[in-house]
C-alpha cells in the first residue's frame, strides 16, 4: 500500500510537472524515483502514457494488455489518478480564468464608479438647476401677477370734469396708472458729449437743467427741444448734480461734482451765465445736494468724505460743517442726501453702509449716537456679510415715507415716522443696481409710483401700494439708466444715463404698453445679481488693490513735492486746489457715477 501511495505521488508530480514551478515540488519528485526502481519504471511508463513521448500509442496499448490482474488494478488506479490530474488542471484553469474575470470586473467597476459619480453629480446639478429655475419662475410670476383694480377711472373723471365737480382733474390724472402705462418716448435732447448724470426741472416746469461728464451744464426749453443756455460749470471732473434753487427766479443753479467742489452759477436774464463760484469743498466726491423747498439761498451738500455741509449764500463764508457721518467712530462716505419737505429741519443721508440715517439740525450732538436721530435698515441686511451701499434716497411729497435704493439689492420703502430700527414697509424688485450710483424717485403728485433705472438699460415703474411693475421701457442704449426726474405738474418724465442725450417720456401711446420681455429681463437681472453675490471675496481684492495704488500715488506725489523747484501753482480763488486725481483717490473703488469721457 505504501508503494502504491508512492507511485501515486510520483504520477501526480509527473502529470503536473509542466505546471509546477516551485523548487520544492521538483525535489520531492526526485526522492520518489530514488526509493524504488520498479516504481520509477511504472512512473516512467505512466509518464509515457500520459505525455506520448515513446513514439506512438501502439506500444503503450500492448504493454497494458500483457500485465497481470494486480498491474491492471494498478493501471485502474493510475488511470483514475490520471483522470484526477486532468480535472485538477482544468479546475486550476477555471479558477485562473475566474480570477482574471473578477479582476477585469473589478477594474471595470473601478472605472465605472467615477463615471457614475459624475453622472450622479450631473443629475443632482440638473435637479438643482431645474429647482432653481422653477423657483425663479415662481418668483417672476409673483412679481408680474395681475394688477389690482385702478383707483382712478378716466371716463368717470372726464364726466365729473365736464359737470364741474372735479376741480383737480390734472392733479389726479398725473397720478393715475392708466397714464403711466401709456408712457412713450417723445424726443431726445442732444447737446452733451458725455454721460448725463443729473436732471432737474425748475419750479414752473418750463426749463430743465442737465449736467454731464463733459463738465458742461445745459438749461433746456424741453418742449421746443432747444437749449436756453449752456456754460462751463467750473468743475474739474464729472458734474454729478445741478439744481435750480427755489424762489430764485430761475437765476441760481447749485452744482456739485466728482472733484468735491460745490459751486453756484448766477444766470442772467439775457440767457447767459455771469459766473460760477466755489462755495464749499469736500475732500471726496460730492454726489448730491439737498434743497430746502422754499429757500432761495440755503441748501445742504454731502460728500464721500462723510461730511454734510450747510450752505447759506448770504454769508461771507457760505459753508459750515453740519455733521460728520460715523458708525462706531468710523466715517461713512455719503452718496445721497435729502431734506424732509414737511419738516425742513430733518434730513436723511445714505452711503457706504446699509443704514438710512435721519438727522435733525436742531438736535445734532455727535457725542450722543453720533448725532443721529434714528436709523432704518432692512433687518436682513443689518448683519449681512454682503456689503450693501445706499446709492440714492428720497422723501415722498409729504415727508411721511422714505425710499432707499441699495446697490445689488432691492428698493425699500420706510415710514419716516416709525421709531429707530423699524423694518421696511414695502420692497420693489426686478431691476439691477450695480454698475453706477443709480438714482430712484417717486412719481406722481401724491408719490403714487416708484421709478428707477437699471443696469440692463431699462426704466422700471412700480405701483407703490401693490409693489407691482406697471411700466417697463428701454431707456438707454449705452446700457445704464442713472437719473429720473418727474415733471412737477405734468405727466412727464425726463431720464438720462450713459447715453449723451436726455430723453422725454409722456403718456401718448394709444394703448397700454405691452411688457414684452419683462420676465426675461427680470430673470437675467436676478441671475447676474446672484452670481455676483458668490464672488464677494473679489471685492476685498479690489479694495486691497485700490489701497496699494492709492499708497503708491501718495508716495509719488510727496516725492514730486520734495524735488527742488516744484511747488504749488497759483489758483483762482473760485477754483478747487485739488485735481481730478486727488478726487479719484478720495473717492475710492466702490462706486462711480460714470466713467470719465
UniProtKB/Swiss-Prot annotation:
Q: In which pathway does it act?
A: Protein modification; protein ubiquitination
The family database entries (PROSITE patterns) matched by this protein are listed as: WD_REPEATS_2, WD_REPEATS_REGION
Biological process according to GO: myotube cell development; protein ubiquitination
For the modification Omega-N-methylarginine, the affected residues are 204
Q: What does this protein do?
A: May function as a substrate receptor for CUL4-DDB1 E3 ubiquitin-protein ligase complex.
Q: Where is the composition biased (Polar residues)?
A: 1-24
Q: Which Pfam families match?
A: WD40
| Positions of short motif Nuclear export signal | 39-50
Q: What is its main location?
A: nucleus
Describe, as the record does, how this protein assembles with itself and its partners. Answer: Interacts with DDB1, CUL4A and CUL4B. Interacts with KPNA1, KPNB1 and XPO1.
The protein's name in its UniProt record: DDB1- and CUL4-associated factor 8
Please name the disease the record associates with this protein: Giant axonal neuropathy 2, autosomal dominant: An autosomal dominant peripheral axonal neuropathy characterized by onset of distal sensory impairment with lower extremity muscle weakness and atrophy after the second decade. Clinical features include foot deformities apparent in childhood, and cardiomyopathy in severely affected individuals. Sural nerve biopsy shows giant axonal swelling with neurofilament accumulation.
Compositionally biased residues, Basic and acidic residues: 65-99, 124-137
> Which spans does this entry mark as compositional bias, Acidic residues?
100-112
Amino acid at each position: 500500500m505504501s508503494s502504491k501511495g508512492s507511485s501515486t505521488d510520483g504520477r501526480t508530480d509527473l502529470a503536473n510537472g509542466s505546471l509546477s514551478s516551485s523548487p520544492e515540488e521538483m525535489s520531492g519528485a526526485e526522492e520518489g524515483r530514488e526509493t524504488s526502481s520498479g516504481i520509477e519504471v511504472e512512473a516512467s511508463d505512466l509518464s509515457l502514457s500520459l505525455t506520448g513521448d515513446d513514439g506512438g500509442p501502439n506500444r503503450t496499448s500492448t504493454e497494458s494488455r500483457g500485465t497481470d490482474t494486480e498491474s491492471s488494478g494498478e493501471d485502474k488506479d493510475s488511470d483514475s489518478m490520471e483522470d484526477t490530474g486532468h480535472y485538477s488542471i482544468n479546475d486550476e484553469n477555471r479558477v485562473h480564468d475566474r480570477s482574471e474575470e473578477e479582476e477585469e470586473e473589478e477594474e471595470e467597476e473601478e472605472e465605472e464608479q467615477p463615471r457614475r459619480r459624475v453622472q450622479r453629480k450631473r443629475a443632482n446639478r440638473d435637479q438643482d438647476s431645474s429647482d432653481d429655475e422653477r423657483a425663479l419662475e415662481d418668483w417672476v410670476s409673483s412679481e408680474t401677477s395681475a394688477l389690482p383694480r385702478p383707483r382712478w377711472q378716466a371716463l368717470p373723471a372726464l364726466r365729473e370734469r365736464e359737470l364741474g365737480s372735479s376741480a383737480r382733474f390734472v392733479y389726479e390724472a398725473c397720478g393715475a396708472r392708466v397714464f403711466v402705462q401709456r408712457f412713450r418716448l417723445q424726443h431726445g435732447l442732444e447737446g452733451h458729449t458725455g454721460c448725463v448724470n443729473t436732471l432737474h426741472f425748475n419750479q414752473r416746469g418750463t426749463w430743465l437743467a442737465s449736467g454731464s461728464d463733459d463738465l458742461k451744464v445745459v438749461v433746456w426749453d424741453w418742449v421746443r427741444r432747444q437749449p436756453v443756455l449752456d456754460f462751463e460749470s467750473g468743475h474739474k471732473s464729472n458734474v454729478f448734480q445741478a439744481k435750480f434753487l427755489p424762489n430764485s427766479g430761475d437765476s441760481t443753479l447749485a452744482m456739485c461734482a466728482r472733484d468735491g467742489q460745490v459751486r453756484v452759477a448766477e444766470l442772467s436774464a439775457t440767457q447767459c451765465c455771469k459766473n460760477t463760484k466755489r462755495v464749499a469743498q469736500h475732500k471726496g466726491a460730492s454726489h448730491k445736494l439737498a434743497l430746502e423747498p422754499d429757500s432761495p439761498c440755503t441748501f445742504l451738500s454731502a460728500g464721500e468724505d462723510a461730511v454734510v455741509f450747510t450752505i447759506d449764500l448770504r454769508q461771507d463764508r457760505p459753508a459750515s460743517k453740519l455733521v460728520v457721518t460715523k458708525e462706531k467712530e468710523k466715517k461713512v462716505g455719503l452718496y445721497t442726501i435729502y431734506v424732509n419737505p414737511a419738516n425742513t429741519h430733518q434730513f436723511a443721508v445714505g452711503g457706504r453702509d446699509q443704514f438710512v440715517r435721519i438727522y435733525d439740525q436742531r438736535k445734532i450732538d455727535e457725542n450722543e449716537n453720533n448725532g443721529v436721530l434714528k436709523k432704518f435698515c432692512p433687518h436682513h441686511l443689518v448683519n449681512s456679510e454682503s456689503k450693501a451701499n445706499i446709492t440714492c434716497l428720497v422723501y415722498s411729497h409729504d415727508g411721511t415715507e422714505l425710499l432707499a435704493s441699495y446697490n445689488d439689492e432691492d428698493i425699500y420703502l420706510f415710514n419716516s415716522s416709525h421709531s429707530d430700527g423699524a423694518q421696511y414697509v414695502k420692497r420693489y424688485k426686478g431691476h439691477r443696481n450695480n454698475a453706477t450710483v443709480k438714482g430712484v424717485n417717486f412719481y406722481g403728485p401724491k408719490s403714487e409710483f416708484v421709478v428707477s433705472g437699471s443696469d440692463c438699460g431699462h426704466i422700471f415703474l412700480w405701483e407703490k401700494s401693490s409693489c407691482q411693475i406697471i411700466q417697463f421701457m428701454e431707456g438707454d442704449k449705452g446700457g445704464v439708466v442713472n437719473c429720473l426726474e418727474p415733471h412737477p405738474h405734468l405727466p412727464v418724465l425726463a431720464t438720462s444715463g450713459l447715453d449723451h442725450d436726455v430723453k422725454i417720456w409722456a403718456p401718448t401711446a394709444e394703448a397700454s404698453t405691452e411688457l414684452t420681455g419683462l420676465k426675461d429681463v427680470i430673470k437675467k437681472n436676478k441671475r447676474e445679481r446672484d452670481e455676483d453675490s458668490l464672488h464677494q471675496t473679489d471685492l476685498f481684492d479690489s479694495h486691497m488693490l485700490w489701497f496699494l495704488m492709492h499708497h503708491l500715488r501718495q508716495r509719488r506725489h510727496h516725492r514730486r513735492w520734495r524735488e527742488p523747484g516744484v511747488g504749488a501753482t497759483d489758483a483762482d480763488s473760485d477754483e478747487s486746489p485739488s485735481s481730478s486725481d486727488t478726487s479719484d483717490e478720495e473717492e475710492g473703488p466702490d462706486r462711480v457715477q460714470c466713467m470719465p469721457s
